Amino acid sequence: MSLKKSPFFELRSGSVDTLLFIVKTADLDALRAELVKRFEATPEFFADDVVAIDVRRLAGHERVPLDDIRGMLNDVRMRAIGVVAQPEQHAWAASAGLPLLEARDRRAPSSKAADEAPVQQAEPAAPAAGQAALFEQAGPTLADAGAPPESPAPAVAAQSATLVVDRPLRSGQQIYAKGDLVVLGPVSYGAEVIAEGNIHIYAPLRGRALAGVHGNHDARIFCTCLEPELISIAGIYRTTENPLPADVLGKSVQIRLEQEKLMIEPLRLT
């Protein structure tokens, strides 16, 4: 067999950036009701996003019909691409015809939706440790697509350069930064900015902003006009189905994590 590269295709090890849909109950009626409740008011937030169905939270004897769960996800316009399971769950998890994926968590604490966002004076961020939610935002290596095992990271990693975007971002556009991200123009509805570090937006944020996507709980989001579809730090997110308080909506703010909660605080610029 020739080892020469083909001009028509290549096969390479890689990884996929995806969400985990974490199944925590075998009660399909309860699961369906929660999905409807979560997304009936904001059906576009995860529209056409791909997800991996994670069944590792189920008890050893519990099984769920993955075809039914895949159908539920399709109903809210999310596409299941595989299953994450414990080794003892592999036999039945593979029966749905979805590939088994390996998940490598970057940090032990799991993510949860931020149901409340207190507004207060800035304080030092506290260490995060808590429960898990329906969804977790996964970093680019969370759902493995055949990538070889990663070698241990060095104790001190070189900091990635800051990415500066000096143009408006329109609906459908996405920016990804391996370090910090600075945006000098508006982030419109339907646009998305993602960073492994902090995000600074010196214009209105009306789309989605996701900071610390590899599990960096110390990441923050700063913007001069907060009107977002979604904000997220290390997978802990908040959408507009939970309205923002008047003293931060449309204002200059910083967003950080404190004990697994999103803290949204006005910036004192004067």
UniProtKB/Swiss-Prot annotation:
For region Disordered, the annotated ranges are 105-129
Q: How does it assemble?
A: Interacts with MinD and FtsZ.
Q: Family per UniProt? A: Belongs to the MinC family.
| Keywords, alphabetical | Cell cycle, Cell division, Septation
Query: HAMAP family from the xrefs?
Result: MinC (MF_00267)
PANTHER family noted in UniProt:
SEPTUM SITE-DETERMINING PROTEIN MINC
Name of the molecule in the record? Probable septum site-determining protein MinC
Q: Where is the composition biased (Low complexity)?
A: 116-129
Q: Which GO BP annotation is one of this protein's?
A: cell morphogenesis
Briefly, what is this protein's role? Cell division inhibitor that blocks the formation of polar Z ring septums. Rapidly oscillates between the poles of the cell to destabilize FtsZ filaments that have formed before they mature into polar Z rings. Prevents FtsZ polymerization.
Q: Which InterPro entries match?
A: CAP/MinC_C, MinC, MinC_C_sf, MinC_N, Septum_form_inhib_MinC_C
